[in-house]
Amino acid sequence: MLQNPQEKSQAYPRRRRPGCYAYRQNPEAIAAAAMYTFLPDNFSPAKPKPSKDLKPLLGSAVLGLLLVLAAVVAWCYYSVSLRKAERLRAELLDLKAGGFSIRNQKGEQVFRLAFRSGALDLDSCSRDGALLGCSLTADGLPLHFFIQTVRPKDTVMCYRVRWEEAAPGRAVEHAMFLGDAAAHWYGGAEMRTQHWPIRLDGQQEPQPFVTSDVYSSDAAFGGILERYWLSSRAAAIKVNDSVPFHLGWNSTERSLRLQARYHDTPYKPPAGRAAAPELSYRVCVGSDVTSIHKYMVRRYFNKPSRVPAPEAFRDPIWSTWALYGRAVDQDKVLRFAQQIRLHHFNSSHLEIDDMYTPAYGDFDFDEVKFPNASDMFRRLRDAGFRVTLWVHPFVNYNSSRFGEGVERELFVREPTGRLPALVRWWNGIGAVLDFTHPKARDWFQGHLRRLRSRYSVASFKFDAGEVSYLPRDFSTYRPLPDPSVWSRRYTEMALPFFSLAEVRVGYQSQNISCFFRLVDRDSVWGYDLGLRSLIPAVLTVSMLGYPFILPDMVGGNAVPQRTAGGDVPERELYIRWLEVAAFMPAMQFSIPPWRYDAEVVAIAQKFAALRASLVAPLLLELAGEVTDTGDPIVRPLWWIAPGDETAHRIDSQFLIGDTLLVAPVLEPGKQERDVYLPAGKWRSYKGELFDKTPVLLTDYPVDLDEIAYFTWAS
């Protein structure tokens, strides 16, 4: 280290300076000194140069000062950023101007969402305990936005999110990303082309998320739907009931488009409120997909309070629809019942479908087609049959009941409320009963009770009920901000007849203790309303909280232009279909097995017997548990293996409870299939024990008269 220059000079011998005493001793020196006091006026003494050793030290000092200042500034900025980041974090949720993401306890991102209708001004955000709120968009527009954190249990963290526009007319849209290929999502709605897990195709602009008939139209969503989606990464989202909810998707970025709007839509703002849309939802994250689903079902869905009749689980339903269509009459019904018994099937449940009345909207039998309906019912009862009738919410203009409905104001009306609104449905033009009106409800149920009393009708098949059959603009006795509530009111008509009733719409209707029927199927193999769509549809409806499911008729509707194989379903398709149906909560025939040959009849008898001995007891046991747990009867494989990535993808196998695994053949010309067994000990229907699992059994042999099933053997 360099020393001070003065200190360095002190190391040399000191010279004695000539002081006054010296001058006094030497006159010559005094004279010389006097001579040097006279200097020129412009004389400038030489400036002392700083030492070369001093320059590095000065540079270091300046640099050090700058570094200190930079460190202070950086620390201040970091402190502000840290406080801001802390302000914009809600537990495991990180809020950005353009959206937010959520991590699980392991730090893995399990949910990501983007704000598509605007960004947040983060400087307008503040937190108050568990509530994080923002008051401005990045464009300076006012809004009401908050995220509230709730921990309902140790293993579950939930976030209540709400974005409400301050001004009417705008739409609010958020994009929920489905994640990478390893993330799988389930739920939403019954669809025309049904996949499990959800598979996005192309682009879909947001459409009203309301009940629709996907069989008769190209509507985006089916008759059973809920605002609920579930991820294999243990995240779930439930959109609030108050939202004017529209749903679209973008397959390129793998996102669902969640939108709230009041323009160009059947949704209406609540009375007295401006049409300022609100998009609000709850996102919950748990430890695994099964446990978070159980939490969401218990928290947000109703449960059935009762269980349908045991015979509905045990015995097949025999419907006249696909066999006779609208040409049904008394002789055909009696002949059908006779053939059922002649081929040694149980006298179980016979359903008289469309059309047995003089006109649509009447509530009695057409005396031409059914000259002695009372005698027909007596003979069917004596043979051991329980008989149900097809009903619907329409009253056609040529019905004897139409004038009464107009006079008593029983129908859904046009927007002014002065006239009934007429609609076109698959059987003509008519009015629609307004089930928000107590008078219409009493009138409809009164007619059903009279039918039951007069003919000893066991119950009813409640067809239609989708919002897509209401006019675009309408009014009801009680205003409907959410039009799907009309569908729910219709399902409530089944409550007095629940034991053998079936409905085909479901929206917040999990408490209706009857069977929910999937929309009609075509007699084809594929995912577009065909056999391959059956298991994905049943699993989807199960996840939406509907445990009692009727997967429509064996073989499909057999509509000529929508049938593979002619006027009846292909023989092989029919056999494979009845094998799957035998393991579903309910089983229904219309095209009877004797329309083919003796072998098909024998296979149908075999599976009807297997259902009665093996499947029905388990179904009834699980049905009894539903009223307490809300757990589905038909379950995906991941239900017992939530961490198994392979189980998340399988759409051609299912569980009944936790102990019976079913793997049907769903492709033409196949008598083998790959079967995936999750971890555990499984015994096949052939007696084989598989204890080294999980395992994929490739090309497992399954004959035409078989279905592969395995029971839990531990």
Curated annotation (Swiss-Prot):
Keywords: Disease variant, Endoplasmic reticulum, Glycoprotein, Glycosidase, Hydrolase, Membrane, Nucleus, Signal-anchor, Transmembrane, Transmembrane helix. GO terms for cellular component: endoplasmic reticulum membrane; nuclear membrane. Residues 1-56 are cytoplasmic. GO terms for biological process: carbohydrate metabolic process; positive regulation of insulin-like growth factor receptor signaling pathway; positive regulation of phosphatidylinositol 3-kinase/protein kinase B signal transduction; skeletal muscle fiber development. InterPro entries: Alpha-glycosidase_related (IPR050985), Glyco_hydro_31_C (IPR048395), Glyco_hydro_31_TIM (IPR000322), Glyco_hydro_b (IPR013780), Glycoside_hydrolase_SF (IPR017853). Changing residue 622 to P: In IBGC7; uncertain significance. Its EC number is 3.2.1.-. Changing residue 476 to N: In IBGC7; uncertain significance. Changing residue 611 to W: In IBGC7; uncertain significance. Interacts with IGF2; this interaction is required for IGF2 secretion. This is Myogenesis-regulating glycosidase. It comes from Homo sapiens.
